[in-house]
């Protein structure tokens, strides 16, 4: 989903996906469900990955979250500002982000009932874009209703509008779609992982 409408250049720095049977241990010694590294590696606990994919409306999807980080890492700033082709658009988004992030942090502090973006987004600004990505795809109608300006920015960033999607499809239907489209996608794609180039 995250690469469907954006340039493959957004992920050209990504090269390795590691799944762990148990909770992986980060460099600081903490166990966590997963993380994305600026150098191009994503590490995730398999069960957390599976659970996130099996429930499309719980606002928790580890894979969407970590790939959101990877998208943010393209410009090496780690600031919840993904790549924009236009410098003017990037500046507009940065100004919007400052206000929106402060407002969501305040909403969580005051418990105003407008916390559609999960609290983890307020722990560090670098987590904001990834948590918003999860909400955008898993609770799109709620984000559009409660945070319309933020939703409109995400539509612009991902170039899709999930609140308008007619319905969710089952895992079996998605798998059929993958099989039907895979050969054509591979034929048209110029993207290859670093592993394939080695």
Question: What residue ranges belong to the model's regions?
Answer:
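Short glycine/proline-enriched turns and hinge-like loops at secondary-structure junctions
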Residues: 11, 54-56
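Generic beta-strand structural signal
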Residues: 15, 40-42, 60
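Extended cationic-aromatic binding surfaces that line active-site or macromolecule-binding grooves
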Residues: 1-25
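Active-site recognition of the HExxH zinc-binding catalytic motif
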Residues: 58-75, 130
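Metalloprotease/metallohydrolase-associated module, dominated by Zn2+-dependent proteases
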Residues: 4-5, 22-54, 77-198
């Amino acid at each position: 989903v995250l690469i469907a409408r954006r340039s493959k250049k957004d992920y050209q720095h990504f090269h390795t996906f590691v799944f762990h049977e148990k909770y992986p241990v980060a460099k600081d010694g903490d166990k966590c469900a997963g993380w994305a590294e600026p150098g191009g590696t994503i590490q995730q606990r398999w069960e957390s990955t599976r659970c996130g994919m099996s429930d499309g409306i719980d606002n928790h999807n580890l894979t969407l979250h970590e790939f959101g980080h990877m998208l943010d890492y393209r410009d090496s700033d780690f600031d919840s500002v993904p790549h924009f082709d236009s410098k003017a658009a990037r500046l507009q988004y940065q100004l919007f982000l400052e206000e929106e992030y402060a407002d969501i942090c305040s909403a969580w502090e005051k418990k105003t009932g407008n916390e559609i973006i999960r609290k983890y987004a307020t722990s560090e600004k670098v987590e904001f874009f990834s948590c918003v990505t999860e909400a955008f795809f898993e609770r799109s109608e709620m984000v559009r209703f409660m945070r319309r300006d933020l939703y409109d920015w995400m539509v612009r960033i991902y170039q899709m509008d999930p609140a308008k999607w007619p319905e969710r499809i089952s895992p079996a239907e998605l798998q059929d779609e993958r099989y039907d489209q895979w050969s054509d996608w591979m034929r048209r794609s110029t993207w290859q992982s670093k592993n394939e180039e080695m």
